[in-house]
Amino acid sequence: MPANSWPDNDSYKELDPLNSLLSDVSTTEESVVETRDLSLPSRFQGRRGKAALVLTIVWSGTIALHLVSWGSIFILGLTTVLGIHALGVVFARPRHYQKEIQGSLPFVSILVAAKNEEAVIAKLAKNLCNLEYPNGQYEVWIIDDNSTDKTPHILAELAKEYDKLKVLRRSAQATGGKSGALNQVLPLTQGEIIAVFDADAQVASDMLLHVVPLFQREKVGAVQVRKAIANAKENFWTKGQMAEMSLDIWFQQQRTALGGIGELRGNGQFVRRQALDSCGGWNEETITDDLDLTFRLHLDKWDIECLFYPAVQEEGVTTAIALWHQRNRWAEGGYQRYLDYWDLILKNRMGTRKTWDMLMFMLTMYILPTAAIPDLLMALTRHRPPMLGPVTGLSVTMSVVGMFAGLRRIRQEQKFQVHTPFVLLLQTMRGTLYMLHWLVVMSSTTARMSFRPKRLKWVKTVHTGTGE
């Protein structure tokens, strides 16, 4: 595909398809590739330079705020702006979705990219082949990405048992990782709606009946369902991830209700084929295809809805090291898209509400953790409190409020579970303590991206099939 940038004209009707942002260059999933700028299309060149520039601006700006007389006034003003936006998010009323389809049900293609998933792939395949949706109206494609374990044999046997199950095996020379696998199978699919699940997913039998009606609104380009942790009771890390997912989906629904952006989370994402085609498929130049696709859909004037119920369950990582690898990948991919599409964001291609929401999110999620280090160093040097204290306090407060509200909303959906406010508060406090790891992850990631050559590295999460 050509690597041309967006046209200068801002008219929606005159926009070129977003597939012009992508290229045919790709990298293998498990190898570490030092990416030279000259090998990338123009939009993805210079990521390290962009990251270094942002880091320099953030550090110098933070230091300057400690040295000027009006620094504290500026921070209070920033906190006020963020606080007003936060109040809007908290009090926004989530949309009520139409639950019934008017007319015939659309055809759905379900895609799963799998590599060495012998422990979980059979359970998922049987799960997906027995969903509550009319026979002949959906298909299941599992892409075996050159597995070296028993995955190919398991899939071959299951394909004999289920007519709707189709298997595509990729060669050892295939490139692009998960994005490459999804792009390779896409031309073979028939669905108007494309669903993507991870190999460890556990899908509610009525999932399609809840999700498909949301696509009746023509502007909806994708839907993300809530992710739940199947092994949440295992240890501190999995319990923390459970609370984190409740916070994430609550923020997602509140942001979309306010006119902001909804985001894809990979597992449990549903994309309208028309929207996916207009964006050029999945980007093989990123380590987080879902986060990248989120931006490209919104830049192409599509909306993304987020659904609390039903949830797709997945295995949470169980060790601090596994969590560190996973969250560093998420942080790098999330930050990288701002570097890739910054000019289109500033041109307000998404619309004012979405652009404002995205900038507020970037400021809180990426810029504030990056600024925390020079702020702390200056505070220690000058024997003064950290300048960013008010903004940090607001961010922590929003996290606590959102996590409690998210956990409460989940319990309301699951009417058979009754948890007292005290139990929810304990879960929120534990989740808040767990969430502090993001401060270290974000600050280290933004610094690392400024100095080290870009590495398209994917560390496979091992799935054991132990989640209940």
UniProtKB/Swiss-Prot annotation:
Tell me which SUPFAM superfamilies the record gives: Nucleotide-diphospho-sugar transferases
Location of the protein in the cell: Membrane
The record's listing under CDD domains reads: CESA_like
Membrane-topology descriptor:
Multi-pass membrane protein
**Which terms in the Gene Ontology molecular function aspect does this entry carry?**
hexosyltransferase activity; magnesium ion binding
Checking InterPro entries in the record gives: Glyco_trans_2-like, Glycosyltr_2/OpgH_subfam, Nucleotide-diphossugar_trans
- For this protein, the parts annotated as crossing the membrane are 51-71, 72-92, 358-378, 387-407
Give the EC number.
2.4.1.336
Q: What protein name does the entry list? A: Beta-monoglucosyldiacylglycerol synthase
Give the species. Answer: Nostoc sp. (strain PCC 7120 / SAG 25.82 / UTEX 2576)
